[in-house]
């Protein structure tokens, strides 16, 4: 039997890494009971130890270095599920698997902070035996900027949860009869949200809800762009609960996603599950992930953006053929497939170990 360590340190995080951990951990635990050749050790926050069954071993994120020592000579494979991991054990016979989600630091960091990442990421990849990326876009980014030393990159797309089957709850900021557009994600400069605010003058009967963590200074930049008369119409709501998110997807006229930097772009696929029209930028991975199931902005002039939205909505019905095609497409990105692909990879990588 081979022993595989999987890092689920981010289980409690309200982030993309946390979302993946909360979906992947229970599915992997469920299928692992029927995998006689693999034994799993999950790295989890202390309070989650034992949560996924007694057939799994657990080490706590808080005491990782000490808790993992008794297993040191048993480990065949260590899966760092993202590039921001805090620790991984290196040793003879331990195959290092790394999943890379993006190289956004190339576009976001400057000066000494950029230099730090430019030094750290190649070292991280050099010390990995196998590297997985979450989109073709990320694959091309890594190949263009990091020496791979003959490593072949493999793409395993993220899954998304079955949000359309989850409970819904109307947020307090949403009225019963509001017509609104939705934007979901961290309120950061890379999300390009400032382009939406002048566009909204062409939709005086609509509200715009920008939902997500907004403690960065960019949120203040957006607030300054919102005219006093529009402050009840264009809202930075802050973080929202999952049931609120599902209600908003189900009732929004459209999801607006002008982001410049995405490793994957989960909200566009989640919106499709509800038959909600998606408007997207053509930047980074978004054309790859949305494919033909979104309308795209080629200009960020407010009137041109508004025209794309008006034309897209005019031919869209939540119950129409285009919406159903988008739903079907979105369902191909699921965590059952994601789990199956990683389990297959674990089998392959441990076949010749030790």
What does each model-identified segment do?
Residues 1-354:
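Carbohydrate transferase catalytic cores enriched for Leloir-type hexosyltransferases
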